[in-house]
Amino acid sequence: MTAPSVPQLPAKPSRIASLDALRGFDMFWILGLHEAMNALLHKFFPDSSCAKMLIAQFQHKDWAGFTFYDLIFPLFIFLAGISQAIALPRRVEREGKSAAAIHLLQRALILFLLGVFYNNGLTNGWDQIRWLGVLQRIGIASAAAGLLSLCLNTRGLIITTLALLIGYAALFYLVPVPTSGARGFEMGNNIANYVDSMVVPGRLHQKTWDPEGLLSTLPAIASAVLGVLAGRWIQTSGSPERTVLGLLTGGLVLVFAGWAWHPFFPVIKKIWTSSYVLVAAGWSAVLLALFYWVIDVKGWSSWSTPFLWIGANPIALYLLAGMQLFQKAGERIAGKASLPTGWLTPIATVTVLLLFARWLSREKIFIRI
């Protein structure tokens, strides 16, 4: 099951343009594109049933179910796993396995601390710090997936993923909530939410539990490992056509498996259920196949340039957006215009963001962690 060294993979281009573009596409939604789309649809199609359907897709599900916007976060973690599969063998070759492992842990620590900072950790008391959040989950999941990929071959990674997903599901079926005796998936009354309320210090996003909580980080690691597996496939598939076919087929199989599991272990983003992992990873693979085919195989890439700008500095832009810098600039622009600010502000905000990302790219400023 274990491999003595990282698999030696065939040489590929140092950057896969579609991977950078899809990362930028994904981050663009996080940074405000969904708000801009909602504003435009509300403004120009207020009574359209189609517009209402689209608006619903740009919101998270309250609990069980799946929307397009529920894909955005796990897609980023999936792509982080792919990046590990591509970058780690090169780092091991240059610096050795121990140095690569130390780098993974250092990066995870930096992301964790940045996540605390993002949630106003420097201005609040210890009891008001949100210790778990988006950046913390990205750091932990990607580091864990990277460390696993240093130690395990592909078969070992598959077994580990299954163990994480099945083990997490078993907790909900076998371990009752001590305070209520409940087994299951009710919001606020399940084992994952209970562990958050009893173990995680500081401020929880939902007061008594957190959508980026402690137990639900385990299946998030599986999301990243599935990305590692996809990355290894890209490296070893042999031809662009086979790469695309494998991503499409594997993605659709995962989507089907996730929804087949849904009646027994529902698709719920806020506790990162195992069925949710499969559905999200499946659609992530399908999206990557489409981007890879269009950009890297067919060479139709000019349309993706704005996404490449964002994908080159995703974490830096995320932190700046969290400081409301782009929104404040958008509000100032909208305030000086004669149009209603309710829908103009989100448009101005994403425009400022794009212009700043373009400037960073033109100046070759790439902030890596």
Language-model features: where?
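Alpha-helical transmembrane segments and their immediate juxtamembrane cytosolic regions
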Residues: 1-369
